[in-house]
């Protein structure tokens, strides 16, 4: 494919690379709810108290600390499939095995075992994310970042919806054990995407020792960005802080506060969620290049925060099927758009030689709202109620939006090389 052809919008969207990015996004999204919303609903059905459920958000801490072992994925190249795809395959095989083991656990009689298995799923899933994120950072050209990020997020969200819709309906008809087994099968099928992905060339300057694999990514990041590195890290932590906190408890809100059945939750997610993800992915891929990254981040960020007020209305008014459908639809549209722009910025901030570690650092920080401070959400709900919780999470978006103004243009919108531009 020539650079000119690849530079045209139509050819970018229709390329095999975008299809693979979407498929790998699906692989990344599949395990997430198994340690998040679906697990929370399983614990809710097992009569586990709200504070314990909120504490279970901590099983996802590997997503927050994955930067600690990401240097190993930059340093070591598996003997098969290459530096990026090799690690994808290893983690995907591991995920299939641990998810099957999770299916045999019982949270009501052995909560501790469920927690350990959930941590294992999160660790393998986080490592898979490191490999896939590095693959995207290495493979996507500058002009492909917006579309590639949108394709990845679209696949990611579709996977989450598959688990959170069909999965919940299946749980109502059968059991959560069947849901986990079914997810393991889908995870096994995702291995096909790993074989179809192109393996990026290993840079000559990649780390040759563990020491350099650990030190170089951080030193290079701060040297290249200067003072803006601190703003970039704060932005990564705060842009989606409130949304991450909502993510950890919204399933319990539907189930316990609104007294919705698993089938109802699954049906609404299927109808409103799939439509929202599709529209959000299209809008993100189309609007981000036209608006520019900074304006896209601001617009999408405001939309993300605003959707939480629909949950405030639900908490105050009680169950309304119209409002539930509207909240889920708008939430998925806004969050898909925000996440796509967010990830495109992360790619722009990384150096391909050490992309696994640098991207992992940024995405690790982006999950602190749920993984590190998830327990705060449980305390707010227990002490002040759901309406206060959702209102507070909307306000938590403000610091991240302010930081968007301070991100240097050279960081979030690097110039496209003339020969790579489309006509």
Would you name each region that the model predicts?
Residues 2-15, 199-231, 423:
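Juxtamembrane intracellular "pre-TM" segments in multi-pass secondary transporters
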Residues 126-140, 337-351:
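Intracellular juxtamembrane helix-capping segments at the cytosolic ends
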Residues 88-108, 302-319:
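C-terminal ends and interior cores of transmembrane alpha-helices
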Residues 65-66, 146-171, 365-374:
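Glycine-rich segments within core transmembrane alpha-helices of 12-TM secondary carriers
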Residues 31, 37-52, 239, 248-266:
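Short amphipathic helix-loop junctions that connect adjacent transmembrane helices
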Residues 295-342:
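C-terminal transmembrane helical hairpin of 12-TM major facilitator-type secondary transporters
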Residues 65-82, 279-296, 381-382:
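Helix-to-loop junctions at the C-terminal end of transmembrane segments
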Residues 90-97, 178-195, 388-406:
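Symmetry-related core transmembrane helices of the 12-TM Major Facilitator Superfamily/SLC fold
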């Amino acid at each position: 494919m020539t650079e000119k052809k690849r530079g045209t919008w139509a050819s970018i969207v229709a390329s095999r690379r975008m299809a693979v990015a979407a498929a790998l996004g699906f692989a990344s999204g599949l395990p997430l709810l198994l340690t998040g919303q679906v697990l929370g609903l399983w614990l809710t059905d097992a009569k586990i108290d709200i504070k314990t459920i909120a504490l279970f958000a901590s099983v996802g801490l590997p997503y927050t600390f994955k930067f600690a072992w990401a240097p190993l994925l930059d340093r070591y190249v598996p003997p098969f499939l290459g530096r990026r795809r090799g690690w994808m395959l290893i983690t995907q095989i591991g995920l299939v095995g641990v998810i099957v083991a999770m299916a045999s656990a019982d949270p009501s009689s052995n909560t501790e075992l469920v927690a350990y298995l959930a941590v294992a799923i999160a660790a393998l899933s986080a490592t898979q994310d490191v490999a896939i994120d590095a693959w995207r950072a290495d493979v996507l050209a500058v002009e492909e970042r917006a579309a590639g990020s949108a394709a990845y997020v679209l696949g990611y969200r579709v996977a989450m919806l598959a688990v959170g819709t069909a999965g919940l309906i299946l749980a109502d008809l059968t059991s959560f054990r069947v849901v986990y087994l079914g997810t393991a099968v889908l995870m096994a099928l995702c291995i096909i995407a790993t074989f179809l992905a192109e393996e990026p060339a290993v840079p000559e300057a990649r780390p040759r020792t563990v020491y350099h694999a650990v030190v170089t990514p951080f030193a290079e990041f701060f040297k290249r960005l200067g003072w803006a590195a601190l703003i970039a890290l704060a932005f990564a932590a705060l842009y989606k802080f409130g949304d991450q906190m909502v993510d950890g408890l919204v399933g319990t809100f539907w189930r316990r506060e609104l007294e919705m059945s698993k089938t109802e939750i699954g049906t609404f997610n299927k109808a409103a969620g799939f439509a929202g993800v599709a529209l959000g992915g299209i809008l993100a891929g189309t609007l981000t290049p036209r608006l520019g990254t900074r304006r896209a981040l601001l617009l999408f960020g405001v939309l993300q925060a605003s959707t939480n007020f629909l949950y405030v209305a639900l908490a105050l008014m009680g169950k309304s099927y119209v409002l539930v459908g509207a909240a889920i639809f708008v939430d998925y549209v806004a969050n898909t758009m925000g996440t796509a722009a967010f990830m495109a910025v992360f790619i722009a901030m990384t150096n391909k030689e050490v992309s696994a570690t640098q991207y992992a650092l940024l995405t690790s920080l982006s999950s602190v709202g749920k993984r590190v401070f998830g327990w705060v959400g449980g305390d707010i709900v227990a002490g002040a109620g759901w309406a206060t919780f959702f209102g507070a999470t909307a306000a938590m978006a403000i610091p991240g939006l302010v930081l968007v103004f301070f991100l240097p243009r050279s960081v979030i919108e690097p110039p496209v090389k003339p020969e790579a531009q489309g006509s």
